[in-house]
């Protein structure tokens, strides 16, 4: 049985309160998605950690945005179910849970939009030519413990191992800190632990992904 929940993440160094746009986006998910929405924050995160699979030692040193990147990978592999950025939602998610549950696909999401393609510069020379095979990172539903999520999670842990000592020496101090946007010594680039893992997997397993969910609403959400 597919885990019929949507997980959202609001984690960080100081439990910063959401602004009004974020609160409105979250409220719209609660009302319009027609499934259970779970907001994972610093206070309840521990209750979702699976026995034998603790958060990586380096998690504590990540920027807030990278913590959310890490957690969506962790949750999609170990729990499955839905994920959404905290953005406005005006549709029922149940038909998409049904479609995935009644298929052999690994996941279902929204197709990437060529004009909005979030491909990092290191990916663009080849992956930007194949945007039609990709799903957006903003929202999706995955079955847990598939070959897709296993490769996704394993690659994440590999990068975390590689960067651990640098993270200890230069932990994030800014919510949206990344090596390619702030020159601070923080070692992880903006898309390094999500986009640069997720999109190549979408390309490799495009035939096992359903790309029929509505494209996320990206106006006035921050």
Language model segments and positions:
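Short acidic donor-binding loop at the edge of a beta-strand
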Residues: 79-82
């Amino acid at each position: 049985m597919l885990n019929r929940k949507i997980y959202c993440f609001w984690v960080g160094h100081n439990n910063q309160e959401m602004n009004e746009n974020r609160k409105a986006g979250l409220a719209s998910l609660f009302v319009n998605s027609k499934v259970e929405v779970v907001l994972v924050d610093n206070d309840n995160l521990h209750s979702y950690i699976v026995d034998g699979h603790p958060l990586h030692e380096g998690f504590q040193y990540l920027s807030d945005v990278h913590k959310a990147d890490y957690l969506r990978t962790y949750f999609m592999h170990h729990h499955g179910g839905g994920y959404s950025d905290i953005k406005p939602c005006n549709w029922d998610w149940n038909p998409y849970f049904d479609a995935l549950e009644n298929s052999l696909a690994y996941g279902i999401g929204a197709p990437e939009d060529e004009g909005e393609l979030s491909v990092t510069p290191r990916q663009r020379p080849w992956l930007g030519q194949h945007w039609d095979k990709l799903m957006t990172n903003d929202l999706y539903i995955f079955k847990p413990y598939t070959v897709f999520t296993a490769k996704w999670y394993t690659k994440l842990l590999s990068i975390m191992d590689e960067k651990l000592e640098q993270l200890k020496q230069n932990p994030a101090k800014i919510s949206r800190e990344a090596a390619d946007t702030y020159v601070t010594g923080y070692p992880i680039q903006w898309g390094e632990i999500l986009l640069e893992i997720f999109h190549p997997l979408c390309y490799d397993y495009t035939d096992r992904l359903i790309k029929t969910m509505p494209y996320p609403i990206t106006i006035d959400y921050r």
